[in-house]
Structures are given as C-alpha cells and as structure tokens.
C-alpha cells in the first residue's frame, strides 16, 4: 500500500503552496527575540531560491550537503531546497566539536557546507587539514571573512529566481537525508532517510496527535534531530498547520512562548519538564491552548502528575529512535492511556518482545523491543556505507532490533525498561538505570539524575549516581543513601554518589553516559 500516493518532497511543497497560499507555514524565533514569518507560498519560494543557489554552486542529484546550524529559517530552506533537486542533506549536531564534525563530513562524503559565523573558525581549521571532500562553505551571516571558497548564503539566495530552475526526475525511494545517530554509546552511524520516509512521517505523526490545519505546533527541539523533523515539522507541514521553531530552549521563556503563539501541540523531554517545574508559580500557568504535549522517555509518575496538574496538560507518550523515523509505539489520540506504558504499536507497524535467541516472548516477560516496518518507507533504509551495522539491527523481513528492553501486557500495551547497554549486572541481578533514576528523581532536593554501573571486583558492577541539586540545596551522602534504602530493594541500593553542577547531554536531552563511566 502506497500511503503517500507516490508524492516526493518537491511535489509536496508545490502542492502546499497552491493549497494553503498565504496561510502562515513557519514562524522562527531567535534567541535574541527576532521573529521571522513565512506563508506557505513564501516558504516554497524561499525553498526554490535555495535549490537554485545550490544548483549554481554545482550541486546535483545525489550530492551531499552538510548543515551545521542552530534552529533558523535557513535550515528549513536548505532541507527542502536540497530535496527539490534530489541532493541529500547531512545535518550536523550543532553541539559537536571539530573531531566529531570532521568524522561526519568524512563519512557522509559532503562536498558543501552551510553554517554560521560562530561555527566557521572550526570549519576553517578542518579545511586547512584537507581531510574531507568539502570544497565550499556558505555562511548565513551578513559579513563574510575574506577567504577563498566562502560565500554568503543570503546574498546568493536573494539573487535567485523564485521558480525552480533544475528539476531532475525524482522517486520517493531517493535518499533525502543522511542523519547521524547521537552516538551516546559508540561512533555515530549515518541513517539513510528517503523522500518516502519523510512523507510518511508527516502523515503518521499528524495522525498520532490528530493534527489539523488550524493547529499551531511549537517546538524547541533542534532541527538537526529526528524529533523536530519527523514528529513536528513534517506533521505540521503535511496538514497545512503552522510550525513554530524556537532557536533554543529557555526554561524561563518556554511557557510564555507556548502562550504567545497560541500553540495547540508542543513536545517536551524530561529535562524540560524538570526545569519548568522549578520556575516560579504563575496564575497564568494554565492559560494556554495546548491539546497535547508530545513526551519522550523517561519520567517518574510523581513528576508526571505534578507537571500535568500544575500546567493543566496531558502527555502523549511516543517511543521511537532515529532508525524508526517516528514514534512507532505510542499513545493514540482517541484511545485510553495507561501510564507508565509507552503505548501501543502504531499503524503500519508490528511490535514484539523477543528473547536473546530472537524468539517472541509472552506478555509480562522482559526482552528486547523489536519493530517491523518497511525499510526505506516506514523505517530507515540502511546505515550509509555500513552494511555490517545494518545487518546487525535490521532483518531481511523488516524486523528492527532497537537495543531497548521492555515488556507488554495482555492488551498490547508496551512498557519501556531500559537500554540494553544501561542494564547493570549486580551480583546475578539485573538492575535498570531508568528505574533507579525515577525513584531518585522524587527526592525534593534533586533536580537531575543519572545512574551508571561501574566495575566492581566482587559483584560485577557497583551502582553510582550523578546528581544535580536544586538551587541553594545541599545533600549529604548519609541523607542520600538513607533515602535509597527506604525506597528501593536492598540489591538496588547505590554505592556511590557524585554531586555535579550539570550532566553531559546530547542534542535531544539524553545523558551521554559514556562520558561518566
């Protein structure tokens, strides 16, 4: 069944401009408060100009172009401008430094880069090392360095016509993007995403939150991340809704932005919820139009209830990863929700819990969460130039091994336990880091928490907590370990505590555990 009707991204944008015309498509708010607005017609014209810009710089179908940008209109222009001419976007995490960025450039074969002045010194050094295929850099800023191979993105774009000049034949099976995984446990892998993947993501994510053309979807998730692209942007654009892209998250500003733009849908991760909850109470906390808050793992029930009660919202849980494109397990718009369940398998997907021998497990037993989809359509196509890694997680019949552990109940609701690599082996017992983190997060003095296993000569692994305290609080080891003993089984009680000012996180708010072991 062809859910997207054979329509690639170029056709999508031409149709959106015709159907929705002067309706607001995109609102971007920068960290300095500058706001840019584009109608569907204007946005399509900017996308066309950007496509023409790339064509004048020698970019053709199949070429890879890297983007190292914070949330901004130029990211959207480039994403779909490249897709219109059959070129391939390679978004780079804006937090990455030189060595990691070089590695992605090398392993994606990107020949052109679009970035901003703040990141340019790093790429100037990368070019001098001559270790990549990069031959040109476009800067989104007005002022330019007097360097060879550097040009102004804005000036070049504004010189282009608003109609597309180069339109090679496209297929929905063509690659639109190579999105590198966050690499929290190993080197990032390039996830190949097709035009079909992105079109399907729009329809699927819109179904998941019952999105309409009168909705306003606001996000602070980074544009280089799968959540922003496939859960938010593609859903909003596919339904003719308004997409609000905020440059960076600010706990002090976020709720005001939700209210100012009259958002009906937004998305939150645990870090956002915890930092919002320590903001001063306001009589206007529940003065909003939010219908759903898309939520991604992981939160204790106490934290969830407190957040929902204070702000008058409900969470729509969604579980997925870069390779699944969307939240393939989640709550459904009209169905019951069963916290702490992560929901049920969505349409076009199957889900199973499997044991270490790849055999399906019955309800109630913990094993690996496995998902069945269609590669290149409802799940990723492959890892770029890495067939060995692809074969390790993706079976020939479309079953994807997530590397996450969980279980399901008799009614088909799934429950997340932990990443397999985060399960601690302690004296013959398996201990979930997430379970312990959810318990410790209820301590009134603790704002943020991560638990890791460290080598122990007697019990395989000992358990250590890294915590961030609420402002002005102090916490003794005696108080902390007493709390643990009162709230968890004896074999789960932690051995070590380290108090920190912050915790290392990637772009999607996930703790980078390998930096703590």
UniProtKB/Swiss-Prot annotation:
EC number: 6.2.1.48
One Pfam family linked to the record: AMP-binding_C
Reactions performed catalytically: 4-(trimethylamino)butanoate + ATP + CoA = 4-(trimethylamino)butanoyl-CoA + AMP + diphosphate; crotonobetaine + ATP + CoA = crotonobetainyl-CoA + AMP + diphosphate; (R)-carnitine + ATP + CoA = (R)-carnitinyl-CoA + AMP + diphosphate
UniProt KW keywords: Ligase
Enzyme superclass (EC): ligase
InterPro entries associated with the record: AMP-bd_C, AMP-bd_C_sf, AMP-binding_CS, AMP-dep_synth/lig_dom, ANL_N_sf, CaiC
Keyword Transcription: no
Gene3D superfamilies assigned to the protein according to its UniProt record, in alphabetical order: 3.30.300.30, N-terminal domain of ligase-like (3.40.50.12780)
Family matches, as HAMAP family: CaiC
Family assignment from sequence similarity: Belongs to the ATP-dependent AMP-binding enzyme family.
Name used for this protein in its record: Crotonobetaine/carnitine--CoA ligase
Originating gene: caiC
């Amino acid at each position: 069944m062809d859910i997207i009707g054979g329509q690639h991204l170029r056709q999508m944008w031409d149709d959106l401009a015709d159907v929705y015309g002067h309706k607001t498509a995109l609102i971007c708010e920068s960290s300095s408060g500058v706001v840019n607005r584009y109608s569907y017609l204007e946005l399509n014209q900017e996308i066309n100009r950007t496509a023409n810009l790339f064509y004048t710089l020698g970019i053709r179908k199949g070429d890879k172009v890297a983007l190292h940008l914070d949330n901004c209109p130029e990211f959207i222009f480039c994403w779909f401008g490249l897709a219109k001419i059959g070129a391939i976007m390679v978004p780079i995490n804006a937090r990455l430094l030189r060595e990691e960025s070089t590695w992605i450039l090398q392993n994606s074969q990107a020949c052109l880069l679009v970035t901003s002045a703040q990141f340019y010194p790093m790429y100037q050094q990368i070019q001098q090392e001559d270790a990549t295929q990069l031959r040109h850099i476009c800067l989104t800023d007005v002022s330019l360095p007097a360097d060879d191979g550097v040009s102004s993105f804005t000036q070049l774009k504004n010189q282009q016509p608003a109609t597309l000049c180069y339109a090679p034949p496209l297929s929905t099976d063509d690659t639109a993007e190579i999105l590198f995984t966050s690499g929290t446990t190993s080197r990032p892998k390039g996830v190949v995403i097709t035009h079909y993947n992105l079109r399907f993501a729009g329809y699927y994510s819109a179904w998941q939150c019952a999105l309409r053309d009168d909705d306003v979807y606001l996000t602070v998730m980074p544009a280089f991340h799968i959540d922003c692209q496939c859960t938010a942007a593609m859903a909003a654009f596919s339904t003719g809704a308004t997409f609000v892209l905020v440059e960076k998250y600010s706990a002090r500003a976020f709720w005001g932005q939700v209210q100012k733009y009259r958002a009906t849908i937004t998305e939150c991760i645990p870090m956002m919820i915890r930092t919002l909850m320590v903001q001063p109470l306001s009589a206007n906390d529940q003065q909003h139009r939010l219908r759903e808050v898309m939520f991604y793992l992981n939160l204790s029930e106490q934290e969830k209830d407190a957040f929902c009660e204070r702000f008058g919202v409900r969470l729509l849980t969604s579980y997925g990863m870069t390779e699944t494109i969307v939240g393939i397990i989640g709550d459904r718009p009209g169905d019951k929700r069963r916290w702490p369940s992560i929901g049920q398998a969505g349409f076009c997907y199957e889900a199973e819990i499997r044991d270490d021998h790849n055999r399906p497990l019955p309800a109630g037993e913990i094993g690996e969460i496995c998902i069945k989809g269609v590669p290149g359509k409802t799940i990723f196509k492959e890892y770029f130039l890495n067939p060995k890694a692809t074969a390790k997680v993706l079976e020939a019949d479309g079953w994807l091994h997530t590397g996450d552990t969980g279980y399901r109940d008799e009614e088909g609701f799934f429950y997340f336990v932990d990443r397999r690599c985060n399960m601690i082996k302690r004296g013959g017992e398996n201990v979930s880091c997430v379970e312990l983190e959810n318990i410790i997060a209820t301590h009134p003095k603790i704002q943020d928490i991560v638990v890791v296993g460290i080598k122990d000569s007697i019990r395989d692994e000992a358990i250590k907590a890294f915590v961030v305290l609420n402002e002005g609080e102090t916490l003794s080891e005696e108080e902390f370990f007493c709390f643990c003993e009162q709230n968890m089984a004896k074999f789960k009680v932690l051995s070590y505590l380290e108090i920190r000012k912050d915790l290392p996180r990637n772009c999607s708010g996930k703790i980078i555990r390998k930096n703590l072991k």
